[in-house]
Amino acid sequence: MVLVVVAKDNDDCVWFFDRVSLLLNIVGSSCKRHGMLRHHQYANVMKALECGILESGSGLNQEMGLPRPGDTRWGSHYKTVVNMIAMYPTIHDVLIALGRDTSQRGEWPKIHTMVGVFESFDFIFSAHLMLDILGHTNELSECLQRKDQDILNAMSLVRLAKSKMQQMRSKGWVSFLQRVTIFCNKYGIQVPRMEHNYVPYGRSARFAQDQTNDDHFRREVYIGVIDKISQELDSRFDEVNMELLTCMAALNPADSFASFDANKVHRLAKFYPNDFSSSDLLRLDLQLETFIDDMRKDEMFKGLNNLVDLSVKLVETKRDKVYH
């Protein structure tokens, strides 16, 4: 899934992921720092439990951690953002401790810079935006990465992702900004007034456009990233491709061809007019009845999981010559 790459086409997202990479290198580069992270996390979870913020239960007391910097799989981006927000006070404490540790003096300039970034509205805003976008497309990305792809469920998840992006764009800004503001207020992070001029954090204002914070954060970043994600989804999964993939799913051999649908297979054939004449399409309807009976009765076709398995088995049994 290339949604992270698409998001990185936005300058603020490039800046954000570069800073995340720096954070992972600082916090996760040594066993000593990992030990510090576990200690601070334990203290904060216990404090939260005593305050009733968290509910104790299955999995909630399991230790969370940040993925290694070299873990570049798509899912690691989402996990990183989730844990970074969930563990924000812990990570902040670790950064402050490292910034005061004389044994880390050589790293102080880098650490002190990261503390400033971590306390900036720009960073928190981008983190929450990535949390929402990666979260709303997480199930789709996981589905598309599985070897035994469920095409019908994948297409349903594509439609849901497209719909969610549209909802975020049309009526999600106010609630999103409120959530970011609440988070910032909780941790003492200054929230800029949206009508004031935008001043980029840690970047030269010389290259910044003359615009308000609202123009930048809402129009350029929030809507800009959502539009890029929506365009990528529309490009990869337009109506024709969606119909084609849905029709292909009708030949999925899983569970004794439970998804078989002769009408969808017929529609699939119509996508290839050079290969199927009108007389071929007429014969196809009758041939499909024979095909599905044959597949369900032959033990050699039991236990197949996907179209690749079916194609291999058809060649092995020379059925590809029968149903040509």
Regions found by a protein language model. Give the residues of each.
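Alpha-helical structural modules in large enzymes and assemblies
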Residues: 1-324
